[in-house]
Amino acid sequence: MSSSPSRKNPRVLFVTSEVFPLCKTGGLGDVSAALPAALRELKADVRLLVPGYPSVLSGLKYKRKLAEFDLLPHFPPTTLFSSRLQINESVSLPLYVIHCPELYQRPGGIYLDDDGQDWPDNAQRFGLLSKMGALLASDASPLSWIPDIIHCNDWQSGLTPAYLHYHSGKKAASLMTLHNLAFQGCFPPDEVARLGLPPESFSVHGVEYYGNLSFLKAGIYYATRITTVSPTYAREIQHEPLGFGLQGLLAERSNAITGIINGIDNTVWNPATDPHIVKKYSSRNLAAKKINKLALQREMGLEENETIPLFAGISRLSYQKGYDILLQVAPMLADLPAQLVLLGKGDQSLEKQLVMLAQTNPARIAVRIDYDEALSHRINASADCFLMPSRFEPCGLNQMYSQRYGTPPIVHTTGGLIDTVTDLAPDTPAGESASGFHFHEMTADAFMNGIGRAIDAYYNTRLWKTLQHNGMRKDFSWRSSALAYLSIYSLLMQR
């Protein structure tokens, strides 16, 4: 919907299936709170639209009824509430909540039931989220506030641009952000009619994807513009294997795709103020890291030794995260000598093998099968080097956390890992802008070569401090990400 020429600040409806702290299963929940908050601090008028799960309704201090939709075609009776979500002391976000008891009021998870199975009516549940987003972003909205841009996130709101395409009146521009292309929201073709989409939409030039309806493909096909969560990932998804079958369409739309790195919360991830670590420090007193290192070695049952290089990993334990390769490397790493601390949970086979590995070498390897937020902070503050051998990584966060704490990462060259970690190349022995180490082939030998380069650098005190300082100086703030999104919003408002 075209904006007033006198109004420069965009009105944005941010549509998401999860937002921290009300409802979260992964990184999308964090992004959905942090990015809109950073945008509001830059004077964008951003409002959120979320489903009314039990945790959302119970987590709000108040809610005000805005509109009722008893006769919304193809969906159960629905009420739209407004509220506010307090993000920090200075920022709260206006929130629209879709209250539809038949679709959202139930025990279990956001996407899965108590048995870990997809809810059988997920097409309806997230079809309603998409439909309500499209309604509020058009001249059919019952509200006086109409957005210039509707910002959709992953498959759960992917039908929004499709609904807008088939709306004949005025409508907002749409932005589709792809956080993880592996999840595509595919459903049987009879859902097309049930969701109120016209029959002609079910074609290769529409929502059809290998004989099914794909919410994600719909968003990619119909959105005005597309963003991903890193520039490299934006290129990778236009080719196999990371296009997951959508690479042809994404390549066709390459001129509409922009990669923008996610940010991190610099107030939460700050070694100078972190309440979870033993000794606070900054780039001016990096020697304090050794105090944290000795404390972590003691906590994890490792030999206390401030000079031995301590490597660490914090991750979901999975094939995608490369932990099968790490399993091959860990015994070699312990023999160097070096130490290894791992924190995470996931694939049960990987969990068992890692625990057995730690039991065979308890002075050098420690494994905690869990996710512990406070411990993750202590690991970042204590380790000398962080390991991140992901096969693919749209953006990644831990490599940014580790650099913030003066802990150079070793990363596989994929996605956001390339964009956020500057390699110590062989021809730059002084360090220059380097902040970590890349390895290119997804093999134990290549990974071990990266670890070897890191150990050589670790024993060069001046070079190591350069790497630490370079990483700690990088700007991974959400403000930086928000400025990039504002540039995209500006393009959309000029269309």
Swiss-Prot record:
Keywords: Glycogen biosynthesis, Glycosyltransferase, Transferase
Parts of the chain that traverse the membrane: none
EC supergroup of this enzyme: transferase
Domain of life, per lineage: Bacteria
Binding residues for ADP-alpha-D-glucose: K24
Catalytic activity: [(1->4)-alpha-D-glucosyl](n) + ADP-alpha-D-glucose = [(1->4)-alpha-D-glucosyl](n+1) + ADP + H(+)
MF-aspect GO terms: alpha-1,4-glucan glucosyltransferase (ADP-glucose donor) activity; alpha-1,4-glucan glucosyltransferase (UDP-glucose donor) activity
Biological role: Synthesizes alpha-1,4-glucan chains using ADP-glucose.
UniProt name for this protein: Glycogen synthase
Lineage: Bacteria, Pseudomonadati, Pseudomonadota, Betaproteobacteria, Nitrosomonadales
GN (gene name): glgA
